[in-house]
Amino acid sequence: RFVRATFFQLTAPQQASAQESIFQAFHILNNFDIPTGTEQPWGKASADVPSATQFTVATDTQNCIIYYRTMYNSNIRCIDLKTIDFKNIRYYSMPLDNVKRQPVELINIR
């Protein structure tokens, strides 16, 4: 799997912008997601510790933005590190997802 990742990275076309590069990185990383329960014996998957790709991250180091998606929400979200006052912010943690299910948008065809 890591050989394939390297191949995709080395042969992917250069993108015009940082954001297009991030989207391309997620397309490449999609190939390596591990579905829930595939690394556990049949019927033995743990409900509280999923054996799956729990989150995927791509970082724009030029613009200091961290992009991520999770196993519960494949929409790409971002954190702009330039907006954080690291000298004054206190450590805390929070869940990456408020709801543990994929959002689905209904498209009405008229």
What are these regions (language model features)?
Residues 1-110:
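C-terminus-biased signal that marks the final domain/tail of proteins
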